[in-house]
Every structure is written in structure tokens, then in C-alpha cells.
Amino acid sequence: MSVFTPLERSTLEAFLAPYDLGRLRDFRGIAEGSENSNFFVSLEHGEFVLTLVERGPVQDLPFFIELLDVLHEDGLPVPYALRTRDGEALRRLEGKPALLQPRLAGRHERQPNAHHCQEVGDLLGHLHAATRGRILERPSDRGLPWMLEQGANLAPRLPEQARALLAPALAEIAALDAERPALPRANLHADLFRDNVLFDGPHLAGLIDFYNACSGWMLYDLAITLNDWCSNADGSLDPARARALLAAYANRRPFTALEAEHWPSMLRVACVRFWLSRLIAAEAFAGQDVLIHDPAEFEMRLAQRQNVEIHLPFAL
């Protein structure tokens, strides 16, 4: 179970008291998390999720709180930070920054079809539309410079075939970092995977885990999302799912010609980002009782993205 900071019941009860949500009925750790400690918390007046933030600078947490407030106010189904009776949203528990949020209904969709992907494309388009007019600035701590640094560090330890795949991808990232093309920007979720979306029946009911959120190119966020939701087991893209997601997104925001030009490379960049972070996690948590996602999944996806046949619709 990926709970890095276990909690005693009495400690949790004392923490929850200022929210005036009634007595604690039950709580349990959430196994799916791979970076933070998360708990389902059942209180007299509702169901909630408690997050202890284990990674990242504490000074960035007000950004996440403000972003979720903006998205919640725009009607997106996101968890927002609850306030205590004194108006506090960000607190500390067992020495870690802690947030209490409403628990959203629904379940993860492990085998999405075109309908699920259409819902996700519409959701991402809504998220970008809600923030592009007033972007809350936060650079990603796993952006292009991070990829170049970590790629160089990891490459010598990779098998020859993996190094041969990574090297041209890093060269492409270096060129993109130098060019910094004027692609449209907004706030990004930057981790919109299947395990961060909740469906209640056929309807998308929630988007969670914003702790990688940042500001940046909307196209990059779209590439991250499509790589997970529309990939087959061998890493190739499923055309029906991919086109459903892209069409729904385009209904919210038409693409530009520059985005169409950079689309294939952005899909590859998004693969590299998660291949590297998974390799790092696999080394750091080897032998521990922590959920580790398979790095090979994104190695396969990067190999499949060398020739991209799914293009952006309605490019202007």
C-alpha cells in the first residue's frame, strides 16, 4: 500500500475536529497513490479524502488550492480544499502538508472505450478553457530541462536498445527547449491518466490528483492524456478512441496550425516524461511496499510514436 505516512486514529480525530464535520467513523489508506499518502475518511457528515503531500515544494501548495477553487467555480468536477472554521485550507499533519477534500463519486475506468475518451477530451478542453484567460503560473518541476537532465543521468544504466530509443527523443526535447514555440498555453493537469478520472456509470464524475498541475502548452497536456487513454497494450494508439478524444477536445478549443505541426513530437515528449519518472521511481522504491508503475509501458509507447498517423482534427 502506498501510504508513506501512517496515521493513528486519535491523531486523525484531533486534526479533523476544526472542520466541524462530525465524529470520525472510519478511515483507510488508498493503495493507488504512488507519490502522496491518501486516505478515505468517513465522517458523520460525509465522505472525504485526506492527502498528506509527500513530494514537491510546500510553497507550491497555495497554487494547487487556488487552481482547484477556480476549476470548481467553473463547474468542473474536481476536489477542492475544505476550510476549517477559521478558514484554513492548508494545514499540517505528522509534519506533512495536509488537505481535506470532498470524496467524489465514481470509479476508475480501466478499459476505456470511445465514449469514455470523448468524455475525457471534453473535460480537458473545459479545464483549459477555464484557465487560459487567466493562467495561474507555475513551471512544471518535471518539464523539459528536467527530462534532459534525468535522461542524461539514466541513459548509461539502460540497455542498448533503450538508449537507442531515448537518445533521439532527448535531442528532440533539447531542440524544443531551445525553440520554445509559441503554442497556446493554459493551466495543465499534466497527469490525466485513467486512475485520476472517476466515472459514475457512463458519465464522467470526477478529476482528481492535481499535484503535477502547472502552466504550459495545452498540446502537451493533451498528449499526456491521449497517450494513456488511447493506447493499446502494445503501446500503439487506438484510432477510434484517439479520434473521439481529439474531436471532443476540438469542440471546446480549435487547434492551431503550429499545434498540428508539433503534435507528433509532443506525443513523444509526453512518453519520455513518464518513462523517466517511472524509471526513477523503480530505482528509488525497489523492494518497498510502494505502487510502482511499469517503466516499460512508456518505453513501448515511445517506440510506437516514431510514426504518428493520428493527426489533430480541424487544424486552422
Curated annotation (Swiss-Prot):
<comment type="similarity">
    <text>Belongs to the pseudomonas-type ThrB family.</text>
</comment>
<dbReference type="GO" id="GO:0009088">
    <property type="term" value="P:threonine biosynthetic process"/>
</dbReference>
<dbReference type="Pfam" id="PF01636">
    <property type="entry name" value="APH"/>
</dbReference>
<dbReference type="GO" id="GO:0004413">
    <property type="term" value="F:homoserine kinase activity"/>
</dbReference>
<keyword id="KW-0547">Nucleotide-binding</keyword>
<keyword id="KW-0067">ATP-binding</keyword>
<keyword id="KW-0028">Amino-acid biosynthesis</keyword>
<dbReference type="InterPro" id="IPR002575">
    <property type="entry name" value="Aminoglycoside_PTrfase"/>
</dbReference>
<comment type="pathway">
    <text>Amino-acid biosynthesis; L-threonine biosynthesis; L-threonine from L-aspartate: step 4/5.</text>
</comment>
<dbReference type="InterPro" id="IPR005280">
    <property type="entry name" value="Homoserine_kinase_II"/>
</dbReference>
<keyword id="KW-0791">Threonine biosynthesis</keyword>
<protein>
    <recommendedName>
        <fullName>Homoserine kinase</fullName>
        <ecNumber>2.7.1.39</ecNumber>
    </recommendedName>
</protein>
<keyword id="KW-0808">Transferase</keyword>
<keyword id="KW-0418">Kinase</keyword>
<dbReference type="GO" id="GO:0005524">
    <property type="term" value="F:ATP binding"/>
</dbReference>
<dbReference type="InterPro" id="IPR011009">
    <property type="entry name" value="Kinase-like_dom_sf"/>
</dbReference>
<dbReference type="InterPro" id="IPR050249">
    <property type="entry name" value="Pseudomonas-type_ThrB"/>
</dbReference>
